[in-house]
């Protein structure tokens, strides 16, 4: 009971801090700019709709739609990363790293060039469908690679290469576009929350809201899947259908972001990692809303910095998210490497100290939730095994000398 009380208090504390920071950043985003508007004036304009026409236009037509779209898309991007990390069982997986954002960017660029030849503007729904199609194409190639490549690091490199290919195709298409189309594409392809209208906010809120609700419905299967496929199957989870749903939901989140704001980097990796460490848990029912709120706070804060750091010049949103997100990813990779080394050392120590028979290894590791699968017997004196820890899905390969370890 005491531990539960402490845990719940920690959860409520994290949510309270995130909510307070969220409100503070919303006010700062509306308050700051070339025209300063005080907090009392903001409250009067928002709730009483009283103020000068200039102030009303600045808040209702420019700043408020921008901050809302940043919050919605930031939360969507963070959850897209969380779902991909669950799918691949790797904290480095994200829509930008795996080339999913680049695939969406490629298809949106094609859609914009084609539709702008015949129409003056492109519907938000058309952009979302195009981005979703591009996301699914990239995911399809990654899944094909996953059937051939078991090493996660190599798979991530493959995702990066797919991203480069999609970016190259996008650049090739833009080269042959008309000058007016190039201007629109250039601003969008750099990543920005500027120029958003209320129609954009409504469409994004509708798409992201529906996908968020569906993600909540998957919270229990996600929790079971985090403990390993075998455990999830024993709990009645249809693994094949579940994995398809993870990919679809992640692609919808990523497509919404790319369709409206262009490619935004590192949010899908950095935010879920930070949220899990702040909460001290990976329970989906707690992590999903916290990740969405954390992504909203992160993107709104980065957008504020992008607008005000070198005003009146405005930075690309991806520039700012990379500055703050990349160091977090580097730290995460170093920390995971150290954990893997410690884990390997502990397994080796046990094998050397305790194992006297082949069966002992299987019994001990299976008892402690570790799946021990023979991969290849290279020779009479050497065995190759893959040890997969079901709780954190870290994979290591142990090459053991039969004469030394299995005496």
Residue ranges of model-derived segments:
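Short, intrinsically disordered C-terminal tails of secreted or membrane-associated proteins
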Residues: 397-406
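Cysteine-centered motifs
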Residues: 355, 391-393
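Ser/Thr/Pro/Gly-rich low-complexity, intrinsically disordered segments
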Residues: 349-350, 363, 385-387, 395
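Short hydrophobic alpha-helical segments enriched in small aliphatic residues
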Residues: 359-361, 369, 386
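Residues marking helix boundaries in flexible regions
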Residues: 343-345, 353, 362, 371, ...
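Alpha-helical transmembrane segments in inner-membrane proteins
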Residues: 1-344, 353-356
